Structure formats: C-alpha cells, structure tokens
Amino acid sequence: FIFEMDADFSHDPDDLPRLLYSCAKHNADVCVGSRYVPGGKIINWPKTRYWLSYYASLYVRLVLKIDIKDTTAGFICYKRKVLESIDLNNIWFVGYAFQIEMKYSAIKHGYNVKEIPIHFKDRELGQSKMNIKIFREAFIGVLKLRSKKFD
C-alpha cells in the first residue's frame, strides 16, 4: 500500500490506519479520505473556499461521470498495483488537477475506488498554492480528460 497526504498536517496521520482498513474491508483498490461524504468535515475554511471546492468536485463528477464526492482529495491509500498500472509519465496535470486525473485513471483502469469520511483541518502556517492558472488547468483540463485514452 502507498499513502498520499498533505505535508502540512491538514490530514490527520492517525487516520492512516482507517484508510488501510477500508481498503481491506471494502476490497477497495483506492481509498480516498473524503471531506464530502456523510461524516466528513472541513475545519477552519472560509465558506467561499468550501463552496468553491464542493462545486468543483460536483463539476468533475458531472463532466467525467464518476461517483467520487471529493475529487480533489489528497488523502489517499493506493494498492501498489494501481500505481504500477498507471503510466505516471503520462499524467497531464501538474496543479491540484492531478488529484482528479489520478482518481479518474484508476477508475478507467477498472479499479475500485472507495471514500471514507475524514476531518480536514485547514493549515495553520503557510498559504494555499491555488491560483488562476491552476484553476484554469482543472476547469478546462477536466473537459479534455474525457477524451484521454487509457490502456
């Protein structure tokens, strides 16, 4: 298993065993720590940031026709075989949208993706790297992603 999480401790390392357990319990190939499933929560985000993130995930779900509530989540447990089967050199996105592309790639390769609720805490130090270029990459990129070929 390979884990991904934010380096600023917005994700609670104590939740790592829950991600691992959920992969095993639900026979999931990918387990996503989700802010937007029942029981999930975001702590200390302004309402505008919350709604922007929530509706961005809704947009992705509708455009890509995937059933993941938190498409930009960065707290993930992958089975090793998932990452070995995805050509990481062929990932198009460099901003936050790579989170979307990785989940979509896993689904297109036939892997089972499961979400579990987490409590996401906004960073206490530093600033978000979100900017208009990253937003544009995600917004337009999701439309382009529909036509990407997956082997």
Protein language model regions, located:
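DNA-recognition element of transcription regulators
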Residues: 100
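The conserved acidic donor/metal-binding loop of glycosyltransferases
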Residues: 6-10
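Charged, amphipathic alpha-helical interaction segments
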Residues: 38, 108-111, 143
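Catalytic donor-sugar/metal-binding loop of nucleotide-sugar-dependent glycosyltransferases
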Residues: 67, 90-94, 103-120
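Secondary-structure boundary/capping motif
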Residues: 79-82, 111-112, 145
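Acceptor/aglycone-binding surface of glycosyltransferases and processive sugar-polymer synthases
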Residues: 1-3, 13-96, 123-133, 138
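C-terminal, non-catalytic tails of nucleotide-sugar-dependent glycosyltransferases
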Residues: 140-151
